[in-house]
Amino acid sequence: FSFTNEEYRQVNPDKTFASLGMGSSSSSNSMMSSMMSTDVFKSMPKNTNLFSEQYDVKAGHWPKKTNECVIVLTAKGKISDMMAYTLGLRGIQELDDMVKQFSNEEEVDVTLKNDAYNYQDLLNKTFKLVNAADYYQYDQQYQIWKDKSDDQEYMKNLVQNGEDIQIVGIVQPKDDSSATMLSTGIYYPSSLIDHVIKKSTKSEIVQQQINNHNLNVFTGKAFDI
């Protein structure tokens, strides 16, 4: 999640189209997502020796910790428009307006910009890690887990107290690299996935489901067999 000026926004997976009522299975959503490449966060292969020599480190360093990320620039040293929105370098409302125009079959106002950013604009940007299991809160009265992802105050507090994910490096493909393993984007180490899985497994809702495998903890009813 990004968290700026007391406002949060899910950035991985990106929810730009979901905010318009388009589910991930929607054909329109799939088409638009592929056209605009809304997801900029990606996982690095575990063995960094496979690709690290293909890039020049322009600022900072490759991730050394689980909560560190690196920005991979294009061969020309640029970032995508979507990455600029994700990093807060361009107003996210501008993107939302374009998507809304597209979904309403209106003429999309696309203003091409050649914004210039320096490395300090990108380095040390932070995001918040929120475990999906924490979206749920136990209801003592009905003895079920309720999804609180639509509760803005609940989510705001959850995001605000989430773990920090920080961009610590910026890399660019070397001039002599004919092929590179990583496309442009924001990359996190594979250890972050392991961290999220371990944390999810220890969560109360998951533990309750494991210990009551015949009971659906979301409905309080037995699973149909």
Residue ranges of model-derived segments:
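Basic-flanked hydrophobic alpha-helices used for secretion and membrane insertion
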Residues: F1-I225
